C-alpha cells in the first residue's frame, strides 16, 4: 500500500526567484540587507529585479566585509613623515656649537643673555671669573688686587681686615710673630727705614710694627723688674734703666732717624753709653 506524499512548501530561494513581485511589494529584501545568493550560479535578486550593474558598496555586504579583511592583511600604508622644524641660522649655529663642545659653554665662559628691554631684561653678568674667587678670599691683605670688581654679596665681609679683632687689637700670625721676635732679640729699637723694610717684609703697616715693638719693650722691662735682686750695683742700674727708657723712647727714635749718635741729657754720657750696651 503506497503512502501519499504531499508536496511541502517550496524553499525560500525558489519562492524568491519565481515571485519577484512579491518581494518587491512586501519588502522582504531591502536595500540595506545582504542579498541571498541563489544556487547554481544564479545572480542575486537585486541584480535581476533592477536589471542594472552591481549594487552600491555598503559596509553590510559580505563582499565588502571580506574585502575589508583582505585590505587589513595587505601592505601597510606608509606613515607620513612630519616636516622637520626650521630654525634661523643663528639658532642652528648655536645648536651645533653646543654639541661640539665637551663642556657647556656657559661654564667655560659665561656670557650675558638678553631677553628684552625694560622690566624683563636679563640680570647682570657674574662680577668676575670663577677662578679668581679663591684668590680674593685667601688674600688677607689685599683681597681686591687680583679681581676686576668687588663682589656684590660678600662686600661687608671681605672689606673688613681679617687680622683685626673685635676690639681693634691686631692679631699677628705665627710667622709674623716669629720674625718680630727674632728682630727684637737683635735690635730693640728700629729706625724708620728699618721699620718700613720690616713692615713690607711681613706685609704689615709701619704703625703696627711700631706698636708691636713698644708693647714688646714694655713687656721686656716688666720681666726684668720682676727678676729677684742679689747682684749689687748691677741690679740697681737695671732698676733705673726702665725709667730712663720710658722717658727717652721718642727722643731715641728721632736720633736714630737722623743718623746721629745716641746721647741723652738726663743722666750724663757715661750712663747713656752703659744703657746702650745693655740694650744691645
Swiss-Prot record:
UniProt keyword Cytoplasm, yes or no: no
Comp. bias regions, Basic and acidic residues: 232-252
Protein localization: Nucleus
Residue ranges: DNA binding: 165-224
Taxonomy, superkingdom: Eukaryota
Molecular function GO labels: DNA-binding transcription factor activity, RNA polymerase II-specific; RNA polymerase II cis-regulatory region sequence-specific DNA binding
Keywords associated with the record: Developmental protein, DNA-binding, Homeobox, Nucleus, Transcription, Transcription regulation
Protein name stated in the entry: Hematopoietically-expressed homeobox protein HHEX homolog
Amino acid at each position: 500500500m503506497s503512502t501519499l506524499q504531499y508536496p511541502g512548501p517550496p524553499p525560500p530561494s525558489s519562492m524568491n526567484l519565481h515571485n519577484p513581485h512579491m518581494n518587491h511589494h512586501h519588502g522582504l529584501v531591502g536595500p540595506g540587507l545582504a542579498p541571498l545568493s541563489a544556487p547554481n550560479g544564479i545572480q542575486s535578486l537585486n541584480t535581476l529585479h533592477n536589471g542594472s550593474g552591481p549594487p552600491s558598496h555598503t559596509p553590510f555586504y559580505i563582499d565588502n566585509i571580506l574585502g575589508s579583511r583582505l585590505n587589513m592583511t595587505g601592505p601597510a600604508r606608509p606613515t607620513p613623515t612630519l616636516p622637520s622644524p626650521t630654525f634661523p641660522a643663528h639658532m642652528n649655529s648655536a645648536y651645533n656649537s653646543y654639541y661640539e663642545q665637551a663642556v657647556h659653554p656657559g661654564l667655560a665662559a659665561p656670557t650675558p643673555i638678553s631677553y628684552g628691554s625694560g622690566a624683563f631684561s636679563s640680570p647682570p653678568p657674574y662680577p668676575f671669573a670663577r677662578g679668581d674667587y679663591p684668590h680674593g678670599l685667601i688674600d688677607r691683605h689685599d683681597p681686591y688686587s687680583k679681581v676686576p670688581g668687588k663682589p656684590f654679596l660678600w662686600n661687608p665681609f671681605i672689606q673688613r681686615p681679617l687680622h683685626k679683632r673685635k676690639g681693634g687689637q691686631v692679631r699677628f700670625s705665627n710667622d709674623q710673630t716669629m720674625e718680630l721676635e727674632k728682630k727684637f732679640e737683635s735690635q730693640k729699637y728700629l729706625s724708620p727705614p728699618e721699620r718700613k723694610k720690616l713692615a713690607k717684609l711681613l706685609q704689615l703697616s709701619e704703625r703696627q710694627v711700631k706698636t708691636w715693638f713698644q708693647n714688646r719693650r714694655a713687656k721686656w722691662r716688666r720681666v726684668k723688674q720682676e727678676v729677684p735682686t742679689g747682684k749689687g750695683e748691677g741690679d740697681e742700674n737695671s732698676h733705673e734703666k726702665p725709667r730712663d727708657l720710658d722717658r727717652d723712647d721718642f727722643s731715641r727714635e728721632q736720633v736714630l732717624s737722623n743718623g746721629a749718635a745716641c746721647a741723652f741729657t738726663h743722666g750724663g754720657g757715661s750712663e747713656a753709653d752703659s744703657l746702650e750696651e745693655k740694650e744691645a
